């Protein structure tokens, strides 16, 4: 019975590793896919080869094996804790009647069309702007190497095509990362006299980091989050943990 349960657990770990690597079939590759997949593969190997694990923990490398296991366990706890904080930040919407500036964070543009993730952000922005017709909007994001137009321009075009008045939309098309998204948007807000409380439109995993950058620019961030594509989301959540760590180390 124990062997059956162990094999089932190993198969689950292998399936989880494959799931994190699935975006590779669509040309998506980043570190947030790799380290969870590697951890699940390591767990699968430990479950499938228990005798080897026993020798490792009772042989000459016993202390090293215990240290590595403890470090990995601590890392998993940290990742889960940060994911909890990310989830909490994603559940902080603007209050009813609160004056906000909607800031739509850019994402990949394919030619002149939004990617799946950017389209989800545009849809969320459209829903909020439609329900709050007095709210101004800043579309953010510069032009990447493989993009024919800036991410900000793509957002603006799509929102206008969906029925949002173009006069409500300001363009910030110079930023190349989230920190610049917020810093350059803050400059527009100050110049135009817009509300300094911002409703950040982005994937849920992105909200905590965006709110940190917003606060450092003197803005008070609220969340208008959208769910990520089922195949892409988990890897981006785990990548976001590393991005938050990098931002902390760099002092952003």
Segments predicted by a language model, with ranges:
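A transmembrane-helix-recognition feature enriched in membrane-embedded lipid enzymes
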Residues: 233-252
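Helical transmembrane-bundle signal
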Residues: 16-20, 47, 76-79, 83, ...
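Perimembrane helix-loop junctions in membrane proteins
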Residues: 26, 54-55, 83-93, 251
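A structural signal for short, hydrophobic/glycine-enriched beta-strand patches
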Residues: 81-239
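Membrane-embedded alpha-helical segments of integral membrane proteins
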Residues: 5-53
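Hydrophobic alpha-helical membrane-embedded or membrane-associated segments
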Residues: 7-15, 67-77
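Cytosolic-side transmembrane helix boundary signature
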Residues: 40-73
């Amino acid at each position: 019975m124990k062997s059956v349960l162990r094999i089932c657990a190993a198969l689950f770990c292998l399936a989880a590793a494959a799931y994190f690597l699935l975006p590779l079939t669509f040309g998506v590759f980043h570190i947030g896919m790799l380290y969870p997949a590697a951890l699940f593969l390591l767990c699968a190997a430990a479950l499938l080869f228990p005798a080897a694990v026993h020798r490792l923990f009772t042989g000459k490398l016993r202390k090293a094996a215990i240290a590595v296991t403890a470090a990995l366990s601590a890392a998993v706890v940290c990742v889960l804790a940060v994911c909890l904080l990310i989830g909490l930040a994603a559940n902080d919407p603007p209050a009813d009647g609160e004056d906000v500036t909607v800031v739509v964070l850019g994402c990949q543009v394919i030619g002149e069309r939004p990617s799946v993730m950017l389209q989800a952000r545009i849809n969320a922005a459209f829903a909020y702007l439609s329900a709050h017709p007095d709210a101004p909007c800043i579309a953010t994001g510069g032009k990447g190497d493989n993009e024919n137009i800036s991410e900000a321009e793509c957002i603006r075009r799509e929102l206008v095509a969906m029925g949002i008045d173009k006069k409500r939309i300001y363009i910030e098309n110079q930023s190349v990362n989230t920190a610049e998204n917020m810093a350059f948007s803050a400059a527009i807000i100050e110049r135009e006299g817009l509300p300094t409380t911002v409703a950040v439109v982005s994937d849920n995993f992105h909200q905590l980091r965006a709110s940190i950058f917003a606060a450092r620019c003197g803005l008070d961030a609220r969340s208008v989050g959208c769910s990520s594509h089922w195949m892409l989301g988990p890897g981006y959540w785990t990548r976001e943990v590393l991005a938050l760590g990098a931002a902390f180390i760099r002092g952003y």
